[in-house]
Regions:
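Small-aliphatic-rich amphipathic alpha-helix that forms the alpha element of a beta-alpha
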Residues: 59-83, 100-111, 189-191, 195, ...
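Extreme N-terminal cap/leader segments of soluble proteins
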Residues: 1-58, 77, 82, 86
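Internal active-site segments that recognize and position negatively charged phosphoryl groups
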Residues: 148, 153-157, 186-210
């Protein structure tokens, strides 16, 4: 049986293609260089079995999502991801599971052009923790605190598919492949995020639900907003669900969307439309910022059902 160091070397010591990395996996710490006019942006997310994914989810899907959700955080800051570390807690040494996990993670890292530079392994309940690092030009990072009165509120993509998938699975109903992919293989908006620099006044990735995540922007910016529930971008699957359930709480509060919600001055409407077309990403105006210090959701009477970690 492999020991910890053999496991790391066999499954995760991949060839490095980024010349900025001097030391990666295998030393006490990583060593890399960044340009003098850049700032480092870093974020950490943990995915736990039974909380963030079901026990029967494929190891390749777990690997992909673990990286994708971290990339989404970096994109929300307008940064470009460069490096990541992996901390893997395993209940047992399952070489077939590890092989599938490693291959998928390597494939995803190559696709998104981000390099694994270190990490750790230990024994325990299945947990995957990734810390990701990106770079952004100094003073250009998009924060949550920049929204201004009169700004328009936008969101990328569609909302509610991942939540619908979870709902169906919890009810013992097999979801269609479209919503299942939205849950297991979210697409981080790594091109949209950096493109929003000088356009977005504030930005956040929608991980815990639009209502809750937009509220983070409002609190950080000390503003309020009016959100139009009829403007929410919804897939055919979610629209079909709403026809019978009228459950607007699902797309508003469901979470796991990993889309970008951002605010922008009205003068940027034409630029945002061009971005949507050039990146082939649906970008929808869903509301307006005001000075009320509250969030009013027109057409929705329900209470918050956004994801709570505790």
């Amino acid at each position: 049986m492999m020991n910890e160091f053999e496991l790391i070397n066999h499954y995760f010591n991949w060839p490095l293609s980024d010349p900025s990395i001097e030391l990666g996996v295998g030393d006490d710490a990583a060593l890399f260089e960044i340009d003098a006019d850049c700032q480092i942006v870093t974020s950490t997310d943990t995915l736990s079995e039974g909380v963030h994914f079901f026990k029967d989810v494929l190891p390749g899907d777990i690997a992909y999502k673990s990286l994708a959700v971290n990339l989404s955080d970096i994109a929300a800051m307008g940064a470009k991801a460069k490096y990541f570390t992996l901390s893997l807690t395993l209940p047992k040494l399952d070489e077939i599971w590890l092989q599938e996990f490693s291959e998928s993670l390597k494939e995803a890292s190559e696709f998104f052009k981000v390099s694994l530079i270190g990490g750790d392994t230990t024994k325990g309940p299945l947990n995957i923790t990734i810390t990701i690092m990106g770079v952004v030009q100094k003073s250009k990072a998009i924060k949550r605190s920049g929204a201004k009165n009169g700004d328009h509120i936008y969101v990328s993509g569609d909302l509610g598919d991942a939540a619908l998938c979870l709902k169906k699975m919890n009810e013992g109903i097999k979801p269609n492949s479209s919503v299942l992919n939205k849950l297991n293989k979210p697409v981080p908006r790594i091109k949209l995020g950096p493109a929003l620099i000088n356009i977005a006044s504030a930005c956040i990735d929608v991980s815990d639900g639009l209502e809750q995540d937009l509220t983070h922007i409002l609190r950080a910016s000390k503003v309020g907003a009016i959100l139009d529930s009829e403007s929410l971008p919804l897939s055919d699957s979610v629209q079909d669900y709403l026809k019978t359930s009228q459950d607007l709480g699902l797309p508003l509060c469901g979470g796991d969307d990993y889309e970008l919600c951002f605010t922008s001055d009205q003068s940027h409407q034409a630029e945002i439309k061009k971005l949507s077309e050039s990146l082939n990403i649906r970008i929808t105006k869903i509301g307006v910022i005001n000075n009320s210090q509250t969030l009013e959701i027109r057409g929705y009477e329900g209470s918050s059902k956004s994801y709570q970690h505790f």
